[in-house]
Every structure is written in C-alpha cells, then in structure tokens.
C-alpha cells in the first residue's frame, strides 16, 4: 500500500467525517467512482485495480456492503507479480466465503501456486485455502497439500501452513482427504524438530484421531515423546517459550490427541506419560501474572482431563482433587470456574466421590458467587456429588438458595432439588416436606411432573397419607399460596382429608371452606381438580352434612353452564352422582395405586442445555455407562405390582402354555404371589402421572416381573428357561431383554440391575478381537458375598474373564475385564452365569453377553466403481443368498438406513438407480477367515413396507447365511405367540433361592444344557 496516495486520501477523508451520515456519503461516492472505473477496463491498469480493491476492503472493514468488484479481486490472484497477487489473495479471503461461485474460478490458479516452486506464492495460496476453502477446494487440492506437507524440500514455514490447510480441508470434506496409509506419515511428522510444523501437525492429528483413532495408534507414543520433550524443556527455541512455559499450545494439543485413544497398553509409554503428568500437576501454581496463569492452567486442566481418561492410580486422582479443591477457593473467577467444571468431570471417576465431599462447604460457598456461570457449575457439582450421606445438607442448601436465585436458574434448581429429594430421601415424610417447600418457594418454576410425583408417593404409601394431608392443610392456612400448592393440597385433601376428621379445623365442611376461598384466585385448569375435591369431601362427610351438600351443589350448579367443556362435564356429572347415595361412594372410591414408570424428570435434567464443545471428554461421557447407581436401601413404597413367581419348568414343559397360564385373555399378567407388594422407592425416578385416571391394572410393559422376563415381551419370547425350585423372588429393575438388545447396537450401558447390584458393560472392538469390562456396583450399605461369575461360551468365541472378587464392599464398584476372540461367523451368544449372596438368599442370573455378530463388522463405504465389480464377482448360492422377507417392521428408508448403520453395515447412497432400494457394505473379521467383504442389497416396496427382498453376498457361505439371518432378525418383529425357543436366546431370570450346597456345586455344563 506504500505510495498509494488515493487510498491514503480516502482513508483520511473517512476519518475526518463529523458524523455517520457524512461518512456514508463519502463511502457511497467512492463506491460509485470504483464501479465506474471497473467498467472502463481499457484504462484500468494493474496499479489502479490494486488500489481500488484495497479501497473496497477498507469499506468492507467499515461495515458497508460491497456487492461488486469480486471478480476484479479474484482476477488479481492470477497476476504474475507478488504485489498484485498478494492483494488478490488478501481481499478475496476477506470479501468471499467458501460457497461463493467466483471462488471456483480461482481453483486452478491456486493449485498452480501450491504446486509451483515459489514459496511465497505457496504461502499465499495455502493461507487462502486454510481460511475459506470448502468442499470444492478439498476435492481438487487435498492431494497436492498432502504432498507439500510431507515434502522434505519445503521450508518449515510452508509445511506448517500446509498442515493447517489440510486440517481445514479435512473438516470440510473428510472423504476428499485420502488418509489411507497416512498414519505412518503422521507418525513421521510428529518426529519433526521444528515446533511450528509440530504444532500444526498435532492440530491435524487431533482432527484425524477424533474421526478414527484406531488407524493412528502408532502416533500415541510419539505424542508422549513430545510431552516428555516439552516437560524437560529440551530443544525448545525461545520464541516458543511463553512466560517460561515451553510451547503450552503444543502441550495441550498433544494431551488432547491422547484422550481420543482408549488405553495405553505399553507399560513404558504409560509410565513415561504419568511422569510427565505428575510433573505438570506438581509444578503448577497460581501466580500474579495473568498471561502465565492462563497458559499454565490451560496445560494443567488438559492434564487433569487426561488423568481422568487414563483411570490413573487413586493416589494421582486424589492429588488432582486436592488441586481442584485449591483452585475453587482462589480469587480468580476463571480458575474457580474451571476448577468446578473439572471437579464435576471427576465425579465420573470411580473412588473419588468421597474425596470430593471434603470440599462440600467451599462448593456451597461458590453457589453464592456473584458470577452466574460459577453458580451454575457449583449447582451441577452439588447435584452430581449428592448421595445418601449428604443429601439432606445439599437439598436444604438448594432450598435456601432458591429464594435468592436468578429466575433463569430456578427451574433447573427446582428440578434438581426434586430429583435429589426423591432419590436419596432418608424417609418419605422428609421428601414430602421438601417438595411442598419447593412448591411454596418457587411455584412458578415447579413443573407439573414434580407435584404429580409427590401425589404418586402419597397414594402408594398408606402410612404417609395422614402426614401429607396434615401438611397440605397447614399450607392452606397461608394468606397467599401458589396455584400449584392449591392443586396438590386439593388433591391430597380430597383423597385423604377424611383421615384428619378428628383434628380441629379438618372436618369436611371446614376443608371445603378453606379450599373454596382459593377458588377466585386460580386459573381455569385448576378448577376441575377443586370440583373433584369438593365431590370427595361431600362423599367422606360422616354423618352426612346437609349444609355442606347445599354449598357443594351450589358450586356444581354454577359451573354446569361453564364454557370450558371439562369443567362443565365434571360439574354436571358430580351433581348427578351426588344424588345417588351409596352409588356415589362406589364411583368416587379411593384412587388405585400408581405404577412406577420411567423418569420424566431425569430426562428433563439430562436435556438441560450444555454449551460445552464436543471434546473428547464429552464424547466419552456419552458412551460410558453411568457410575451413579440408584440407591436401594430406602424405605419401600407400596402399590406397584408384586413380583411374579415362575412355576417350576420340567424339560417337557411348554413355555407358551406357561405364558398362557400367567396371562388373562386381555394380556395382563395374573398376580400369582399374594404377598404385599413392595418395590424399591428409589429404583428409577419419576414417570408422567395421569392423576385423573391411574390404571387399575399394570401391564408387563411397565414392569418386568422377575421370573417372567420375556414371557409377555414380543422382543424376546425365550427368556423363560428351566430353573431350580424357588421360594422367593428378587425384583428386576428394567427389562433384561431390552437392555441386551440395546447393547447389541452400542458399546456401553447397563446389562442387568436389581435392588442390590448393577452390572454395566463398556466394550471396545478391533477386528476380530474385543475387550469388554464388566462394572459390578454394590448399591447397598451391606457387602455382597459369594460373588461368582462364569462364562458359558459358544463354539465360535474364545473368551477369557478375569477373576471376580468374592466380595463387593458396600457402595463400591469392581471391574472385571473380558477378552473376546471371534473364531468364525455365528449368531450364537455367550452367557454370563452370575450369582451372589445377599443376607440369607443367593441370587443368580444368566445373562447374554452382547458379543454378537455385528460387533465384528467394520463400516466400509464403497463407491460405484468399487462396489459393482465386487458384487458381480460373487457368484450365486451359497456365497450370494436372496430371500423375500415378510413381516418387516414398517420403516421409512432413512430409518432403515440408520438401523443398518447402527449395526455397522454402511449404506452406500446413490449406487442403486431405484430410489426405493438400499445398497450396503461392511467388512467382517474372524480369526479363521480374516477380513471378508460383505455386500447387501435391500429392495423395498413403497406400497407395502412390511415386506422386502434382501440379497446378501460374501466370500464365505457360512458368513453369508449368518449375516442374512442377522439382518432379517433386526428387521422383523416376530409375534410372541408364534415364537419358539431359540438356543441361548434369552437370559434366565434372576432367582433368589435359599443357599443350597447342591445348587452351589452345579456343573457349568449342566447349567448350559438347562439353558439350551
């Protein structure tokens, strides 16, 4: 820009403008002049074009829209001289975006500059592509940029720009960047001595491993060596040392890349990494210099994340928690925020919860911090660290904070307080007190689900009903109460107000009067609840009260002509029913007990907006089974269906006849066991509550009765197997068959849960090898003894289960790795024969292990040039099998494609000319066959989605048949009544039985024979 007098004068004129209008006039005048000059190309010299393009850029920087001259800017890129080319690249990257059509005109020029010998031109081109390159640039330039990155003849300046440029292209179009065999190249780049190239290459590595970490396992030790080099400050130039910290950016990137790898198997590499992490943890402290603080703590918090990922020794974990405890008490708000956030992440790690509790008082203090973001993190941490031991203190603090909290936080605060109060209630009266306080203090922010839930608890617990009614009566004495309190009080008093009849001020007439005082203040949706309450008060009035009847009838008559249909219908029907005497009592009998259902509040808590980026930690958190176990040693609630006992099945017993004997004609299960029902109150939280019409009979879909798991379930009709004679049952939390089927399509989750233990699985699959970890968590305050776990493997799998400890301590979790090797294709599954002793009973269960056929498939995307030659090369049967499948679940094509992708069979779009068909490919791995390409074609009928034609082809006849049958199983819903027993198809229900020496000495082979 040196010597451009016209540009300098224009900038001075703009700066000298007295107001915005004068500036606009000057800019418009200049834009008109530029437009005129661009039209007259004969007098437009390269100098003038360059000057006018600079002016356009300056006007753009001022915030004005520049909608012309883009072609002139792009044309400067092809100029042979550096000054014009520089202007072209700079202005183009500022004025245009990746989707602009003019950019396509410059692709060839940019490519020529990249592959040319002029390093200055290469840098300009790489900078442009790295800033605004899109999918078109990725398809055209990715191979050239890759060559430039690994070229030994290029200067480091060019190579580091090439690395960042390739990163941009990979993000925009991963398929266009050929990464086959690129792992070795990346490993070589990580040996680079120039820290600029190394930092850029590490940024590229983070993106690559986040997409596919398995291919880059050779880079793992290289990242550790980078950290060692920086930790020892070896060969680190001064320009890369920031306030005494060797290249903090590179340290953070290297540790972030390591977090995408599942484990570090090599002992020496693991030891070296832990030494580096220990040095970082010990060498970081809070100093006065803000810049140094920011850099050192960026490295530290990334190190903490890596420590959590690696499941380091307890001593290092304790050190991390102590360090975070120090950070949450410093004055610097940014460090406090990060300390709270990382302490919340630490809750995911086993055995550190008790250490975190030591900082509870400081965390509660953070709840009163002036910064709302810190208060939110403190709330999340308190919610995550809460258990039976500290629930009362935390919930009371949340209730106290509720009065002063911002309105934007109150809904989340109310939701979490309600969940904690229920989940860890020492007794139900305390839970009722908490919820009523919650409604009283923050009624506007208490969702209907919360008061529905307290009504459910009161309904299901007879001992709680008088207490809840008396508390509801107390709140009605307040001058001003929230409408939600009117709803819950009216409902409870209508159902159970008669239990207080002998207490002063609690007669039916007095309850009617105090409730009727609230009627003018409530909204239309609450009036139906009050009408129901009035009807019930009238019914419970003993002896009959003519005065009360007169008042209630007057209310009913008033609302008989209400415009609201619901109110009108209730008023008319209650009025007529109240005239029928004894029949009135039959119609308005006490509400039946509510079933336990899936928690709607838990879903709400999980859906609270999280603004964090998709880091490696967050991606892992979505895949890991939760370490938070539901506590089961609380006071039980009456009212859910009793556990169902399984009849003794002989070898000749027909399971379908058993299912019929257990079922009514309408499909509901008979209540065989007459014992008092007592499900676990805290087994699983909250479900939507239909107050006006709770079901009188509970279907098996809401409860999986132990011993009949799978009898009424259409997903798995073979879950009943011959079992030993039993005298007791243990209740099951969740559906075993549904849990197994879910784990067949994902790699982590809960396999089994009852009131005493929770068994989770986390798996990692690579080729024909798999590594599973069984997480067994004791949910009680008493130890589980005589714990035994035995694997019953099918012939096609080789399994090795690490020994399981004989005893699981209270509130503890143990882990047992399971190595799986696939020998040949088969759909059979392994079975875990698991048992433990709790108190005087032995509980046993046979559980299917989700090491299914699809776990040994690797997704593979093929182009038409790759697919069709392979498809034609596979001859007919038995390598290629075709079948018309009927009874298919009606799925739209996108849903079917998602289903295929979930079991690692990749849909190849655009290969079949018929839009109603799907073409798919994958690779199967086993020890005997190696890697085998698998191809499939699904032909659907838009007029009838319940049938399709499926063709599967592979290089192995057994694999073809097994894969075809597996896909068919995923597509078909087989009715329960027509399903036969399948070998090893269903888990045995958990059976609680008196300890018997003969039972404990059962032969594993006999167990397997019984299962089959």
UniProtKB/Swiss-Prot annotation:
Chief localization: membrane
Name the UniProt record assigns to this protein: AP-2 complex subunit alpha-1
HEAT repeats: 254-289, 354-391, 393-430, 525-565
Segments forming domain GAE: 742-841
Domain of life: Eukaryota
UniProt keyword annotation of Membrane present: yes
Record-level Gene Ontology MF annotations: clathrin adaptor activity; lipid binding
Pfam families to which the protein is assigned, alphabetical: Adaptin_N (PF01602), Alpha_adaptin_C (PF02296), Alpha_adaptinC2 (PF02883)
InterPro entries found in the cross-reference section: Adaptor_Complx_Large_Subunit, AP2_complex_asu, ARM-like, ARM-type_fold, Clathrin/coatomer_adapt-like_N, Clathrin_a-adaptin_app_sub_C, Clathrin_a/b/g-adaptin_app_Ig, Clathrin_app_Ig-like_sf
PANTHER family reported in the protein's UniProt record: ADAPTIN, ALPHA/GAMMA/EPSILON
Gene Ontology biological process: clathrin-dependent endocytosis; intracellular protein transport
Entry-linked SMART domains: Alpha_adaptinC2
Family designation: Belongs to the adaptor complexes large subunit family.
Described purpose of this protein according to its UniProt entry: Subunit of the adaptor protein complex 2 (AP-2). Adaptor protein complexes function in protein transport via transport vesicles in different membrane traffic pathways. Adaptor protein complexes are vesicle coat components and appear to be involved in cargo selection and vesicle formation. AP-2 is involved in clathrin-dependent endocytosis in which cargo proteins are incorporated into vesicles surrounded by clathrin (clathrin-coated vesicles, CCVs) which are destined for fusion with the early endosome. The complex binds polyphosphoinositides.
Stretches with biased composition (Polar residues): 663-675
Chain spans, region Disordered: 652-678
